Amino acid sequence: MDRAIQSPGKYVQGADALQRLGDYLKPLADSWLVIADKFVLGFAEDTIRQSLSKAGLAMDIVAFNGECSQGEVDRLCQLATQNGRSAIVGIGGGKTLDTAKAVAFFQKVPVAVAPTIASTDAPCSALSVLYTDEGEFDRYLMLPTNPALVVVDTAIVARAPARLLAAGIGDALATWFEARAASRSSAATMAGGPATQTALNLARFCYDTLLEEGEKAMLAVQAQVVTPALERIVEANTYLSGVGFESGGVAAAHAVHNGLTAVAETHHFYHGEKVAFGVLVQLALENASNAEMQEVMSLCHAVGLPITLAQLDITEDIPTKMRAVAELACAPGETIHNMPGGVTVEQVYGALLVADQLGQHFLEF
């Protein structure tokens, strides 16, 4: 079977990179629709406008309405068509970037993204998640290509809430363990076919970077400063994890995250916070070594990620709720079926309870 790997056309990262955005956009197109968070425009609109103007680029800067819905995509497509814009750039959080990618897909033009937080690995992916105008999940929009350009301004990331960086570490934490599991079962990745050795090595390097730099990066972002550790964690959260999950494979950890959405108490937690607990559940499913479990729990605890159900605000009626989580995690088509040998609802239910107990024991010592 053929193997494949995919990634953005170009990845740029550095302090104050947004000031140089126009230079990076210029080779792609000379007329841009800029879609940005209202919050981002509040502190960066002048920087964006000056950067593109200095590069000789025409632009319209529009505020994202807050929901990545088909209605919002259609509105922005109409603006791009009316003004003859030949490329799209999204600046802000995940929904803004997903919207920009979707608009570019329907307009059949290049897309660039500039994430202002490092809370997930989504910016580099060939995927947009669409919701209804009311905020309910609608569908996945699988895109034919990854963004042509990803630009991350680490000075902006450093000023974002520290919890967002921790959530990105939680999302990135799954990359190696899910890629390892998917590789063992020869599961097809989003790139097509089993993982390449390059993708697996990127996934492993992502995990090693989190272990080495995670706690130091959290201290940096708490102080709102850019350090070498923060630079490396931003790259791990955004690029290494982005390429790693898409071309390395996904397995139980993200399926457990999806299962946890069945429990109302978890709805206010970030994606990566729930994924981090999903990693512990996957390791319990795999009967991972005590050393590996301790290593993962130590990292999670150091950066403020949950390792028990109580830390996800699940404290009552646990057996019933975990049964619902296990059933949803094992739904047909879920990525948990990429686990070697397959898994059952009973096995996932047991792993959820064991992971919680392991986390509790860790916190006692």
From Swiss-Prot:
A single Gene Ontology biological process assigned to it is: anaerobic glycerol catabolic process
Protein name in the entry: Glycerol dehydrogenase
The protein's matches in CDD domains, at most eight in alphabetical order, are given as:
GlyDH
Catalysed reaction(s) here are: glycerol + NAD(+) = dihydroxyacetone + NADH + H(+)
Q: Which cofactor does it need?
A: Zn(2+)
The EC number(s) attached to this protein equal 1.1.1.6
Family stated for the protein in its record: Belongs to the iron-containing alcohol dehydrogenase family.
Matching entries from Pfam families are given as: Fe-ADH
Task: Show the GO MF annotations.
Answer: glycerol dehydrogenase (NAD+) activity; metal ion binding
**Biological source species:** Pseudomonas putida (Arthrobacter siderocapsulatus)
The record, for InterPro entries, names: ADH_Fe/GldA, ADH_Fe_CS, Glycerol_DH
Cofactor binding note of this UniProt entry: Binds 1 zinc ion per subunit.
Q: Which keywords has UniProt assigned to this entry?
A: Glycerol metabolism, Metal-binding, NAD, Oxidoreductase, Plasmid, Zinc
Annotated binding of NAD(+), by residue: 37, 94-95, 116, 119, 125, 127, 131
Residue numbers binding glycerol:
121, 254
Q: Which residues form a coiled coil?
A: none
Give a short account of what the protein does. Answer: Catalyzes the NAD-dependent oxidation of glycerol to dihydroxyacetone (glycerone). Allows microorganisms to utilize glycerol as a source of carbon under anaerobic conditions.
Q: Which pathway does the database say it acts in?
A: Polyol metabolism; glycerol fermentation; glycerone phosphate from glycerol (oxidative route): step 1/2
**Classification via Gene3D superfamilies:** 3.40.50.1970, Dehydroquinate synthase-like - alpha domain
Q: Which residues bind Zn(2+)?
A: 171, 254, 271
Q: Has keyword Lyase?
A: no
One GO cellular component term, please give it: cytosol
